[in-house]
Regions:
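Extended hydrophobic alpha-helices typical of membrane-associated regions
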Residues: 191-241
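Short juxtamembrane and helix-loop transition motifs at transmembrane-helix boundaries
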Residues: 12-19, 59, 75-87, 101-111, ...
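Structural signal for membrane-spanning alpha-helices in multi-pass inner-membrane proteins
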Residues: 35-42, 105-113, 129-133, 153-161, ...
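A cytosolic-side transmembrane-helix exit/cap motif
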Residues: 69-75, 138-147, 163-171, 189-195, ...
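Topogenic membrane-insertion module of multi-pass membrane proteins
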Residues: 1-81, 89-94, 118-124, 133, ...
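Alpha-helical transmembrane segments and their membrane-interface exit regions
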Residues: 57-62, 125-133, 150-155, 175-185, ...
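Membrane interfacial helix motifs at helix-loop boundaries and amphipathic/re-entrant anchors
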Residues: 42-46, 113-117, 159-166, 213-219
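Multi-pass membrane catalytic core of lipid/isoprenoid biosynthesis enzymes
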Residues: 54-55, 72-129, 147, 153, ...
Length: 241
């Protein structure tokens, strides 16, 4: 980000830069490997992988926009360089975009092989995202709901492609939920340390382990591991927190 002025406010950014910051796009690769891992574990055909990845990317991006929209008052004094308090985007604008992205993500699920089941899990994910964004400052409930959101990504992806939620997918989702809960809880206690981006990128390593254990082959596992480096590199351009 640009140099800060004496009052802590960053220079005005372009809309594109503001939206990239709001979306925390550097973390999107972790969503893609979540979807890939869910497909591999569920034994699903990759024919619908792209739509699932796009849908869940929109869920994630919408959630990130809403995170800033709900936090606008807090950020005005705690993080004045965030796009809303910095004047790069209005709170109303960010709310509208956030909810629109969730709606589009949910709508894309009708294109999946099992749209009804996918839509139900998608609504559960949307509800969890909105609840997290509204109440995540609570140090007890926030990490739990954040972990639940990640677990639901697995369930949306697997159910949309296969129509079921195999116990292996539920197990992997539970492990990922525990990982993200721990990451979020520690980050809330310790603040945004230099190691937090590594833990976020580490989601891809967990996915790579799941893919390997499920017999997904070296290519899929390598993609997930390579994404660890990609995520860290992107976080140097667009911060992931």
């Amino acid at each position: 980000m640009g140099a800060h002025s004496a009052d802590g406010i960053a220079p005005r950014r372009s809309k594109l830069r503001a939206y990239l910051l709001l979306a925390r796009v550097s973390n999107l690769p972790t969503v893609w490997t979540n979807v890939l891992a869910a497909y591999v574990i569920a034994g699903a055909s990759f024919d619908s992988l792209l739509i699932a990845s796009l849908s869940l990317s929109l869920f994630y991006t919408g959630g990130m926009f809403l995170n800033d929209a709900f936090d606008a008052r807090f950020d005005s004094h705690a993080r004045p360089d965030r796009p809303i308090p910095n004047g790069d985007a209005s709170q109303r604008e960010v709310f509208i975009i956030g909810f629109a992205l969730l709606a589009i993500g949910e709508s894309l699920l009708v294109l999946q092989p099992f749209p009804t089941r996918a839509a139900r899990w998608g609504l559960a994910l949307a509800a969890a995202i909105v609840f997290y964004d509204y109440a995540h400052k609570d140090k007890l409930y926030g990490p739990i709901v954040m972990g639940l959101c990640r677990a639901l990504v697995y369930l949306v992806a697997a159910s949309s492609a296969t129509g079921i939620e195999p116990y292996r997918v539920v197990g992997a989702a539970s492990v990922m939920m525990a990982y993200v809960m721990t990451l979020t809880y520690v980050a809330k206690l310790a603040g945004r340390g230099d190691w937090v981006p590594w833990l976020i990128a580490g989601i891809r390593i967990v996915d790579a382990i799941f893919i390997t254990m499920a017999g997904g082959g070296p290519v899929a596992a390598t993609v997930a591991i390579a994404g660890f480096i990609v995520t860290l590199a992107l976080q140097r351009v667009v911060p992931g927190t």
